[in-house]
């Protein structure tokens, strides 16, 4: 086992604080409308330019192992805030640095760290309750656009694009961000249910210009197995031909004789038909077939539940107003499913989301909800260069997370004003002893840090601005973008309550742990000279020549 290097008490805390300051100082320059960019060197390709706090934090590793421990713990604050609310990472880092700095001063002055932590925790619990009381719902498109604009570094185009996307696909709709091909940002909205499976044969194409299969009022056959024998499909084909309507077959696969016969029938005009593979794999495929069945008022033909393909009747088939199939995607528009049954299915999937443990499962389940309940919107980010594209895509993703958080828990006045108001309301809080009171004061003082940093980044005097804002009431604050004072909500400077709450809670949690640290243990650096054994004795191998 490698030898360890151990530091105690003040020595440990000083080293830890040095690491905290290196990381926090690099991150906090990005805060606010006049925050600066940070350039990150990459081992390959062009450097990345970003204004995203968590992206900066993730890049920082320090040579000194004790300093690095401090930096990594604050990095955890940014990561947790990012995971919980998708934004507020810089605010969380600034709050953590302020609490740690003030807290360690109090510890150095002889205060009991455990009571300090209890005081900080009490202040944060009270502050979170006050934040919730200050919060106002964010339901209208204008407020959503304002939140998106602030989070995207005051880019109103991004804010409006996100608001439009949410308006079109609803709160439950999936909004994804992709790199576009043009210079301008674009919004692409897919109505209905779309999945990533295209036609199985180009001979199904009936819209030559678009290279797609367009089916009007089709029947939809859902099969949970491979279909290779045409005899299994004949009863369905005959029934559909009599009804003079097209047919879409969604199966695990359609191959061999079955696919060839379908192509021939389609080309001769006997029955208008197209076939696609079912989306997903394994259990997820079964679930998605069931989703399509609910959406189209059909049944999944599966031998597991005793339904055989040869005995299918028209009542087993789903229906939709229109289906469009391209080489890569299938879109079912306006399925015939009953709204109450669809909502029941959505509620069932939402319950699975709550029970899911992995982020991947949650994401896939959320996509299924969106396909059933709303739709899918794709924001295509436009930029002149690859470097700008990456930076802008980061900002758009941040803004998207912020707007989702705003819709979820409402909004408060932005620009650090909400924390100032909360601190003044909690100022009368009293702990169980004087050391807890110091902890409460540490937390309340730290709540001024975001507005001070926003002001510093704008090149103004932070103490003057902080005192002016404290003298005001309600949403009165400082707009760092214009240098004006006024009502932050009226000026459209809003922060999602969830983002502010998460930043405060995670910052206090990690800062409390660091304040109560008394010893730090790390591996001793290995002397590179002694890493390899002496190879000098190998010279004697020259005598082995006689073995030839």
UniProtKB/Swiss-Prot annotation:
The keyword Isomerase applies. It is an enzyme of class 5 (isomerase). InterPro entries: Chaperonin_Cpn60_CS, Cpn60/GroEL, Cpn60/GroEL/TCP-1, GroEL-like_apical_dom_sf, GROEL-like_equatorial_sf, TCP-1-like_intermed_sf. ATP binds at residues 30-33, 51, 87-91, 415, 479-481, 495. One of its GO terms (cellular component) is cytoplasm. It catalyses: ATP + H2O + a folded polypeptide = ADP + phosphate + an unfolded polypeptide. Disulfide bonds: none annotated. Signal peptide: none annotated. One of its GO terms (biological process) is protein refolding. Its EC number is 5.6.1.7. Gene3D superfamilies: GroEL, GroEL-like equatorial domain, TCP-1-like chaperonin intermediate domain. Keywords: ATP-binding, Chaperone, Cytoplasm, Isomerase, Nucleotide-binding. One of its GO terms (molecular function) is isomerase activity. It is found in: Cytoplasm. Pfam families: Cpn60_TCP1. Together with its co-chaperonin GroES, plays an essential role in assisting protein folding. The GroEL-GroES system forms a nano-cage that allows encapsulation of the non-native substrate proteins and provides a physical environment optimized to promote and accelerate protein folding. PANTHER family: 60 KDA HEAT SHOCK PROTEIN, MITOCHONDRIAL. Forms a cylinder of 14 subunits composed of two heptameric rings stacked back-to-back. Interacts with the co-chaperonin GroES. Belongs to the chaperonin (HSP60) family. This is Chaperonin GroEL. It comes from Aliivibrio fischeri (strain ATCC 700601 / ES114).
């Amino acid at each position: 086992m490698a030898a360890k290097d151990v530091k105690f008490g003040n020595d440990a805390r000083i080293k830890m604080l040095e690491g905290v300051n290196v990381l926090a100082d690099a991150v906090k320059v990005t805060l606010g409308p006049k925050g600066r960019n940070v350039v990150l060197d990459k081992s390959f390709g062009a450097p990345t330019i970003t204004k995203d706090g968590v992206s900066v934090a993730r890049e920082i590793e320090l040579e000194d192992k004790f300093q690095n421990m401090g930096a990594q713990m604050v990095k955890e604050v940014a990561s947790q805030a990012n995971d919980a609310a998708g934004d507020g990472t810089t605010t969380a880092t600034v709050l953590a640095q302020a609490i740690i700095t003030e807290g360690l001063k109090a510890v150095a002055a002889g205060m009991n760290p455990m009571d300090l932590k209890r005081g900080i925790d009490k202040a944060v619990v009270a502050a979170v309750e006050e934040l919730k009381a200050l919060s106002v719902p964010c339901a209208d498109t204008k407020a959503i656009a304002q939140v998106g604009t602030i989070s995207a570094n005051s880019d109103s185009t991004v804010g409006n694009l996100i608001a439009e996307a949410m308006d079109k696909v609803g709160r439950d709709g999936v909004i994804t961000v992709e790199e576009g091909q043009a210079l301008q940002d674009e919004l692409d909205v897919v109505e209905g249910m779309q999945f990533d499976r295209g036609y199985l044969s180009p001979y199904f194409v009936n819209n030559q210009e678009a290279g797609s299969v367009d089916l009007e009022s089709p029947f939809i056959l859902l099969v949970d197995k491979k279909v290779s024998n045409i005899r299994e499909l004949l009863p369905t084909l005959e029934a559909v031909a009599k009804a003079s309507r097209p047919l879409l077959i969604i199966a695990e696969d359609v191959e061999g004789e079955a696919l060839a016969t379908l192509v021939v029938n389609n080309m001769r005009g006997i029955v208008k038909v197209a076939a696609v593979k079912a989306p997903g794999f394994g259990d997820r495929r079964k679930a998605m077939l069931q989703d399509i069945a609910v959406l189209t008022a059909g049944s999944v033909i599966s031998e597991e539940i005793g339904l055989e393909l040869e005995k299918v009747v028209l009542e087993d088939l789903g229906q939709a107003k229109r289906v469009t199939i391209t080489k890569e995607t299938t879109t079912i528009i306006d399925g015939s499913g009953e709204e109450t049954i669809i909502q029941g299915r959505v509620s069932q999937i939402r319950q699975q989301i709550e029970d899911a443990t992995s982020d991947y499962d949650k994401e896939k389940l959320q996509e299924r909800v969106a396909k059933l309940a709303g739709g899918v919107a794709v924001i295509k980010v436009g930029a002149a260069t690859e470097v700008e594209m990456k930076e802008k895509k980061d900002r758009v993703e941040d803004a998207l997370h912020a707007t989702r958080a705003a819709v979820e828990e409402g909004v408060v006045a932005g620009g650090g004003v909400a924390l100032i108001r909360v601190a003044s309301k909690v100022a009368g809080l009293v702990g169980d002893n004087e050391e807890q009171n110091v902890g409460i004061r540490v937390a309340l003082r730290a709540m001024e840090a975001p507005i001070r940093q926003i002001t510093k980044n704008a090149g103004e005097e932070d103490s003057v601005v902080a005192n002016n804002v404290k003298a005001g009431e309600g949403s009165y604050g400082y707009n760092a973008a214009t240098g004006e004072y006024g009502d932050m909500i009226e000026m459209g400077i809003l922060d999602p309550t969830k983002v502010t709450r998460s930043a405060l809670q995670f910052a206090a949690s990690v800062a409390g742990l660091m304040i109560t640290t008394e010893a730090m243990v790390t591996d001793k650096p290995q002397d590179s000279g002694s890493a390899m054994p002496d190879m000098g004795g190998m010279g004697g191998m020259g005598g082995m020549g006689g073995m030839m």
